[in-house]
């Protein structure tokens, strides 16, 4: 997921093309400070020589237009990406957290989000400008709702009703997918809402979620979006936090021994085969934090899926 990692030089990117144009920024975590090396936006053209679709994550943190309709920095960055893409290249965008999150961090605490499932913020501030910028290159939209502790969770039926009302009030689109990061909320009520609106179920290998196989079985074999596609995301090993996995995986240039959980590759391939058998398209997005280096994880999955090509 995402791109422009200097750790992928020699795998995805050619060193000579970017050597003098790698930017650096410092990321601060409780475990320490980490220097991130980032390639220029134009490197996306080389990314697409290896993979047909890119998941862009930065739209999760800020919308494309502000409340007054003015373009944000993300609007301009996304336009820059589009300039380096061909007509065959595709993009998945993450819907802004401001739309999907029940709570947001403010002043060191998590407080109720006043913009939660705001149809206008989504439609005017994100969806419309995304379609304007990307056109046919927009292959999918991922809504991600944060993990909710048991004492803060709404009943599954209430949460399903909230999403039902939201989807009733935004433009219908067959490219939408929803990732719910609370296992208890993966309910029949939710799956019925997704089916009603043609929204796909994201199968996510993430910290506090049950296994991919369990998520797949809960919905009766996954739920594709209206265009018939299924999304699988390998984000972190189960039971491991963002900080733990980031610290272990940085600088994302190699696999980390023991980090990729046993069975993850096999479960992923099992789901790929199930989706293919029903005649659907599967999009697989892999985070470096799932095992150290996303391209090498993708290679392992490809070899498991088609061993004769190794």
Placement of each model-derived feature along the sequence:
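Residues lining hydrophobic/aromatic ligand-binding pockets adjacent to catalytic sites
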Residues: 1-310
């Amino acid at each position: 997921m995402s791109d422009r990692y200097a750790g992928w030089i020699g795998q995805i990117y050619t060193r000579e093309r970017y050597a003098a144009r790698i930017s650096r920024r410092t990321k601060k975590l409780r475990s320490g400070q980490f220097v991130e090396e980032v390639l220029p936006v134009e490197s996306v053209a080389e990314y697409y020589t290896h993979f047909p679709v890119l998941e862009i994550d930065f739209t999760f943190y800020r919308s494309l237009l502000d409340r007054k309709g003015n373009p944000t920095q993300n609007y301009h960055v996304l336009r820059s990406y589009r300039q380096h893409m061909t007509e065959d290249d595709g993009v998945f965008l993450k819907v802004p957290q401001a739309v999907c999150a029940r709570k947001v961090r403010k002043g060191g605490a998590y407080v109720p989000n006043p913009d939660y499932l705001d149809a206008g913020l989504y439609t005017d501030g994100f969806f419309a400008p995304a379609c304007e910028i990307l056109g046919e290159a927009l292959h999918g939209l991922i809504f991600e709702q944060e993990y909710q502790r048991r004492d803060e969770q709404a009943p599954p039926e209430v949460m399903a009703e909230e999403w039902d009302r939201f989807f009733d009030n935004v433009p219908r689109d067959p490219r939408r997918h929803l990732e719910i990061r609370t296992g208890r909320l993966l309910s029949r009520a939710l799956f019925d809402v997704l089916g009603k609106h043609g929204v796909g179920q994201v199968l996510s290998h993430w910290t506090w979620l049950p296994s991919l196989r369990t998520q797949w079985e809960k919905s009766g074999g996954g739920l594709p979006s209206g265009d018939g596609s299924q999304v699988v995301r390998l984000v972190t090993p189960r039971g491991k936090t963002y900080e733990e996995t980031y610290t272990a995986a940085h600088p994302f240039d190699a696999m980390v021994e023991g980090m990729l959980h046993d069975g993850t590759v096999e479960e992923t391939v099992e789901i790929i085969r199930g989706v293919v058998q029903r005649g659907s398209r599967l999009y697989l997005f892999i985070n470096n934090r799932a095992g150290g280096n996303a391209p090498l994880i993708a290679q392992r999955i490809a070899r498991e899926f088609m061993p004769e090509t190794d």
